[in-house]
């Protein structure tokens, strides 16, 4: 690239069409004075010679010396069938609409079966991730009723799913308002007072406790509105 930011190929195009530009300009000026070439006025010949040269220079600058396709020009050409790129079949499967997911056509079980991952638990890392159960304790509402985030059927299904990926002993499961840890694990579990102060009502808490870690512990709270139990979600 030249210091003046002009492609050498563009400069070559300008040099080649400069002859047409000069003669086109001369014929245009002469035609404005009323001169003719036989029965043909020069005012009609000048622009016919000059305009193709200007178009060639503009095209050379857009394509950087005819080396690449214009970025934002001739968009209608890209819409032709010959320019369309076929989408990957796996990408189309993953980009299903929410209606297909709700109908079960693109469920997580189906995708896992296609990927060959069904029944194979993921490798456990050194820092085990503790998944806390939802708060099942009654939460009084304005009407004086009690509500729970997860129904019994969904909760049992979720528990079986978590047991398959997190075997017993590899994770700590507890309620945010009730400590259910044994004596040996009590040092790793937070106190009920801390959870009551920070955990929103009727929410899900996902905490990570890694032994001998300089980052201590951290928790992630999921709002009730954002919770979706119809499909698995990896946090």
From Swiss-Prot:
<keyword id="KW-1133">Transmembrane helix</keyword>
<protein>
    <recommendedName>
        <fullName>Transmembrane protein 215</fullName>
    </recommendedName>
</protein>
<dbReference type="InterPro" id="IPR031486">
    <property type="entry name" value="TMEM215"/>
</dbReference>
<feature type="compositionally biased region" description="Polar residues">
    <location>
        <begin position="125"/>
        <end position="140"/>
    </location>
</feature>
<dbReference type="GO" id="GO:0016020">
    <property type="term" value="C:membrane"/>
</dbReference>
<keyword id="KW-0812">Transmembrane</keyword>
<feature type="region of interest" description="Disordered">
    <location>
        <begin position="99"/>
        <end position="145"/>
    </location>
</feature>
<feature type="transmembrane region" description="Helical">
    <location>
        <begin position="40"/>
        <end position="60"/>
    </location>
</feature>
<dbReference type="Pfam" id="PF15746">
    <property type="entry name" value="TMEM215"/>
</dbReference>
<keyword id="KW-0472">Membrane</keyword>
<feature type="transmembrane region" description="Helical">
    <location>
        <begin position="12"/>
        <end position="32"/>
    </location>
</feature>
<dbReference type="GO" id="GO:0002040">
    <property type="term" value="P:sprouting angiogenesis"/>
</dbReference>
<dbReference type="GO" id="GO:0046671">
    <property type="term" value="P:negative regulation of retinal cell programmed cell death"/>
</dbReference>
């Amino acid at each position: 690239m030249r210091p003046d930011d002009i492609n050498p190929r563009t400069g070559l195009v300008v040099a080649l069409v400069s002859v047409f530009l000069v003669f086109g300009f001369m014929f245009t000026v002469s035609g404005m004075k009323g001169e003719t070439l036989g029965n043909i006025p020069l005012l009609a010949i000048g622009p016919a010679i000059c305009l193709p040269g200007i178009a060639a220079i503009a095209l050379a600058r857009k394509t950087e010396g005819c080396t690449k396709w214009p970025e934002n020009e001739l968009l209608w050409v890209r819409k032709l069938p010959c320019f369309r790129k076929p989408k990957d079949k796996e990408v189309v499967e993953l980009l299903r609409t929410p209606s297909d997911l709700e109908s079960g056509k693109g469920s997580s079980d189906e995708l896992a079966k296609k990927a060959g991952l069904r029944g194979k638990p993921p490798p456990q890392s050194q820092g085990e991730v503790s998944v806390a159960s939802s708060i099942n304790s009654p939460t009084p509402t304005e009407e004086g009723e009690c509500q729970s985030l997860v129904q019994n059927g969904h909760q049992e299904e979720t528990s079986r799913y978590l047991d398959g990926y997190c075997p017993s002993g590899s994770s700590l499961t507890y309620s945010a308002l009730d400590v259910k840890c044994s004596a040996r694990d009590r040092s790793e579990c937070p106190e009920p007072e801390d959870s009551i102060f920070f955990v929103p009502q009727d929410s899900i808490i996902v905490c990570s406790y890694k032994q001998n870690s300089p980052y201590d512990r951290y928790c992630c709270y999921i709002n009730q509105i954002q919770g979706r139990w119809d499909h698995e979600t990896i946090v």
